[in-house]
Swiss-Prot record:
MF terms (GO), sorted A to Z: ATP binding; histone H3T3 kinase activity
Membrane topology (UniProt): Single-pass membrane protein
The keyword DNA repair is assigned to this record: no
Lineage, opening ranks: Eukaryota, Metazoa, Ecdysozoa, Nematoda, Chromadorea
A GO BP entry: mitotic cell cycle
Keywords for the protein's UniProt record, in alphabetical order: Membrane, Transmembrane, Transmembrane helix
GO CC annotation, single: membrane
Localisation: Membrane
Matches recorded under InterPro entries: Kinase-like_dom_sf, Prot_kinase_dom, Protein_kinase_ATP_BS
PROSITE patterns per record: PROTEIN_KINASE_DOM
Protein name: Uncharacterized protein ZK177.2
A Pfam cross-reference name: Haspin_kinase
Membrane-spanning residues: 1-21
Length: 296
């Protein structure tokens, strides 16, 4: 009887999602019914829990702790990658399951959009070394392997105002693509969840609505990371746009440049916060005019 009531509740919520947003949502209540670690294990490539001794992970460097896990630079399957490790406890199974699914989807986008890192695989690990554990009560840990990015935006500085603008322009276009393809909402865009990677590419291309938009990189590519608060399906784009506007203002404040250059950054991003959606923001010429190569 109880399960029947829960099923009716879930169906009602999914119907509400469809009425409000036109689709269901990955993070809806149905995901909360994952009862054990096997819900996550089934989504990994190995399909089984792997002892640490068999994981064959070579730790090279500790990168940092975040709210949802710990990151290391490692060698795994003959590749130098970033390993994010998160303890699995009953209350986190649903969240980690969804994060893994979204990370896999976003990883595929990296082939056509440089602002997302490639996904290399995942395993559920048992017997994690004690020195790597944040919660001793977690028997198993989820390890997600991603491409190695750059410097956290919060620690990054520049004296070239054009770099500040290209960061925002690239992120807007990347989010437009992700939103178009999978109705992606990051949910936690802020300075610590954006990496700045150096590049030798002078420009990069984005394919949107059958058009190719070419943007100057000025030697950098911003990359979005951490999908622990992300979801797909519903489409409240204003959530991410508002957060990106906050990031834009902070990047402008941190510019090691003249007052004139800081004003140029402010003018380029001032309307970001007022945009209704990513499509609307992509039409904002003030943001793109100093970094766009061509639009055809």
């Amino acid at each position: 009887m109880i399960f029947a009531v829960v099923d009716i509740l879930e169906i009602s919520i999914q119907l509400l999602c469809i009425l409000l947003f036109g689709t269901t949502v990955i993070n809806c209540v149905s995901k909360g019914r994952h009862k054990d670690v096997n819900a996550i294990v089934r989504e990994t490539e190995s399909k089984k829990i792997v002892p640490w001794s068999d994981a064959k992970v070579q730790i090279k460097k500790f990168l940092g702790d975040g709210a949802s896990g710990t990151a290391y630079l490692v060698v795994w399957e003959d590749k130098e990658v970033v390993m994010k490790v998160t303890g699995i406890h009953p209350q986190s199974i649903s969240v980690l399951h969804d994060e893994l699914l979204i990370t896999q989807k976003i990883g595929k986008l990296s082939k056509s959009c440089h602002n997302f890192l490639p996904y290399h695989g995942s395993i559920v690990i048992s017997d994690l070394p004690a020195k790597m554990m944040r919660n001793s009560e977690c028997v198993n840990h989820l390890a997600i392997f991603m491409g190695y990015g750059g410097t956290v935006l919060a620690d990054w500085r520049t004296s070239d105002y054009r770099r500040c603008i290209t960061i925002m322009a690239q992120l807007v276009l990347a989010m437009r693509i992700a939103n178009d393809k999978m109705k992606f909402v990051h949910g936690d865009i802020y300075m610590m969840n954006i990496l700045i990677a150096p590049t030798t590419k002078r420009w990069i291309e984005y394919n949107i609505d059958g058009k190719t938009i070419t943007i100057q990189t000025f030697g950098i590519i911003p990359q979005l990371i951490d999908f622990s608060k992300s979801w797909c399906g519903a489409d409240p784009e204003r959530h991410d746009i508002s957060r990106l506007h906050t990031v834009a203002k902070r990047v402008g404040h941190s510019l090691n440049g003249s007052k004139r250059d800081k004003k140029k950054v402010r003018q380029a991003v001032k309307m970001v916060g007022a945009a209704k959606n990513w499509k609307n923001l992509c039409l904002y010429r003030q943001l793109f005019k100093q970094v766009i190569v061509h639009d055809h």
